[in-house]
Regions:
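Chalcogenol-based redox active-site neighborhoods
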Residues: 1-170, 176-181
Length: 181
């Protein structure tokens, strides 16, 4: 089911978490934040909306590292009911797409609920103080649209890196609903 994300709640603090990567390595929010901020992306392996953006997402995340913005991806789906999203498949997906950031599994779905995530992909861009500054889409080329790419998330997070604030105007992300237990 297609869902749009809510608007950005500017200044909302990032909820703390500690989750395991697909290979059982543990990460906490405090370990992940970069000098200028953190991009938290709720994604999964099977959603066609994620598949359509994953290449640009990974490239943008890599470029943002040079600006002091780190990235973490979190898989929130019930992988028992949706085995394509299980931790083993997450590892394969991360390797296939050359993730340069942790891909964590939210077994209890509590982190997704704490953040207010509703779909995959769902992006949360935080400044260095872990205050929400971006809750929008990756770019204008959702689901393979043609045309010149406008990297909205990248541009927003570059603004966050330089000013600490996100853009006032943001366009909601859309994607597959999170598969709740």
């Amino acid at each position: 089911m297609l869902l749009d994300t809510p608007l950005c709640d500017f200044g909302r603090k990032a909820p703390d978490f500690k989750l395991n990567n697909f290979d059982k390595n543990s990460y906490s929010l405090g370990q992940l934040v970069g000098a200028k901020g953190l991009l938290v992306a709720f994604i999964c392996n099977h959603c066609p909306y994620v598949k359509a953006i994953v290449t640009n997402f990974v490239a943008d995340a890599q470029k943002l590292q040079t600006s002091g913005i780190q990235t973490v991806a979190i898989m929130p789906n019930d992988y028992i009911s949706y085995p394509a999203d299980n931790p083993e498949k997450m590892g394969e997906f991360a390797k296939q797409h050359n993730f340069g950031f942790p891909y964590l599994v939210d077994d209890t779905q509590s982190v997704a609920k704490d953040y207010g995530a509703v779909c995959t992909p769902d992006f949360f861009g935080f400044n260095a103080n872990l205050e929400l500054q971006y809750r929008g889409r990756l770019d204008n080329l959702t689901m393979g649209k043609d045309g010149a790419r406008i990297p909205e998330l990248f541009d927003a997070m570059e603004l966050v890196a330089t000013t600490g604030n996100g853009p006032a105007n943001q366009i909601a992300s859309m994607g597959c609903s999170i598969k709740w237990k």
